[in-house]
């Protein structure tokens, strides 16, 4: 279990948030409902989805490295 108030917890939360928003971008109903705004508070979801789709290789590698760290090292 990772604590959100530690650095590795924030990294895990950020990676999961980016991966989830990138998945939401692939689902048509969720894309129109959640990712329609590009500014403001709801724009964070859109920006995370753009990061997840444009940097999908780096995000995937970071998820694998973080999973290894959380499961075996921590």
Curated annotation (Swiss-Prot):
Location within or outside the cell: Golgi apparatus membrane
Bilayer-crossing regions: 53-73
Signal peptide feature range: 1-22
InterPro entries for the chain: Kish-B, Ksh1
GO cellular component: Golgi membrane
Primary subcellular site in the record, as a coarse category: Golgi
Keyword field contains Oxidoreductase: no
Ranges in the topological domain labelled Extracellular: 23-52
Annotated keywords: Golgi apparatus, Membrane, Signal, Transmembrane, Transmembrane helix
One Pfam family of this chain: DUF1242
Transmembrane helix among keywords: yes
Membrane-topology descriptor: Single-pass type I membrane protein
Cytoplasmic side: 74
Family listed: Belongs to the KISH family.
Protein role: Involved in the early part of the secretory pathway.
Name of the protein in question: Protein kish-B
Source organism (scientific name): Bos taurus (Bovine)
Species lineage: Eukaryota, Metazoa, Chordata, Craniata, Vertebrata
């Amino acid at each position: 279990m990772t604590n959100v108030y530690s650095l590795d917890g924030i990294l895990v939360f950020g990676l999961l948030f980016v991966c989830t928003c990138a998945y939401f971008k692939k689902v048509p109903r969720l894309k129109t409902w959640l990712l329609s705004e590009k500014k403001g508070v709801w724009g964070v979801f859109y920006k995370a989805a753009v990061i997840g789709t444009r940097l999908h290789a780096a995000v995937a590698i970071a998820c694998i490295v973080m999973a290894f760290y959380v499961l075996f090292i921590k």
